[in-house]
Amino acid sequence: REKKEKYIDEPENWEHADALCQLYSILYERYPKLVEPTLRQWNRSSNPWKRRASIVSTIYYATPRRKAPTIKTVLSLIEPLLGDKNTYVQKAVGWQLREAYKLWPKESLVFLKKHTLDLSATSFSYATERLPKNQRNRFKERRHLERKKKKLFLRSQKD
């Protein structure tokens, strides 16, 4: 356990961090009751690599053949990180939403719709990049309109 913590605390780069996440993903698939508490702890860590690992380890390259956690579990780990300022965490949020869409398209779209404004531009781009073009364009338009409304509302509050 101590070695596991050391490696995730100070990876040399995102590739090394994600290679570890692939291992954690396999462990999580086999021993969810043992691994999930660690992922939840990492989700609240001040260390951005741990926060990233807390979500990337849930569904590392989703395929229907793999045993995945529930969508509820995955989204409960993603949601607290929606506003994360770290670029690598933002990318992971988008990437995991994209991967979740492969397994749970309906639930993922509901989540995206609900959190359109909460996602950073990076997360939004990654999350929507594999959607059908017309659907992706609708999400972009919705995001644009909601941001415009929010801006107008904030301006009206200043006056």
Which positions does each model-derived feature cover?
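Alpha-helical scaffold domains
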Residues: R1-D159
